[in-house]
Amino acid sequence: MSTVVWTPLGEADLPDLRELALACLRADGGLPQLADESMLRRLFLVGAGIGGRDETGDLVAAAAVRLEGPQARSATGLVRPSARYGGLGRQLAAWCAERAGGTLLRVVVESTSPQTESFLAGLGLEPTFAEHVMRHDLAEVPRVRRPAGMVSLPWSEDTATLFHRAYRASFAERPGFPDPPLGAWVRGLVEDPGFRPERSRVVLDREGRVAGFVTLSDCWLDQVGVVPRWRGQGLGGHLVARSLRAFSRAGCGEAWLAVGVDNPAHDLYRRLGFLDAGLRSRWERAVPGEGDLSS
């Protein structure tokens, strides 16, 4: 069994962290931004981080614990596919539990495999959030006509209120809906450097009432919503198909989205040509102390 040397993570480890993340994404799928420098820095370098290197110097495992609130700590970790099943995962979990105050309470997983799910469940953690990550190659972009009588408007300072109204009307019925006020919601969009207002759309019906909306960033469908009275009439399909054409015209080689595992829109996206490209998830401990690996 090879020897792994553990050392703290730092800026100099970013290239190797990226290569490790890419290896995990190739094996398990998941959120492609996991390999972006900005996300790796946020996940592994903001708090305390540790990396394990084998006898050749390759980074085979990494983990970190960071604060996500006054007392809330989250852990994340990666193990190279070729180095799994040798106990590295349990070593990382024990290290994270110690840094988190003795008990591992919350884990962020942007590249989730069945083995990861089984491992985390064995630690006494339960999934609290999970999304399908989906990809469209844009080779064949469908066309779905907008329902008759509707008007589509791009994002602007004047239409931002309509977008927010459509967002609330589309999602307010969901359990745990956060319902952010207009100002906070708008800032969350426009402060994202990838946000593409010229490609985003809000749709109004004949009476001028909001019927649905879509917000886009780079080559991602961020949010797609249809108000309840307009569901099942092709508006959601139109918003997605129109967005795919916008991505294609902008030079995107592929389009991405993430959708909750229990969201029926998953079937719509598959009918429009999206394919599943992995899972991302969040895990939390149901019973404090259960599965503690710190001792």
Label the predicted regions.
Residues 9-14, 21-102, 106, 206, ...:
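Conserved donor-binding loop and adjoining core beta-sheet/short helix segment
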Residues 85-98, 226, 232-249, 266, ...:
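Conserved acetyl-CoA-binding loop-helix of GNAT-fold acetyltransferases
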Residues 1-36, 145-179, 209, 294-295:
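Short amphipathic alpha-helix that is part of the acyltransferase structural core
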Residues 171-208:
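A mid-sequence, solvent-exposed acidic-amphipathic segment
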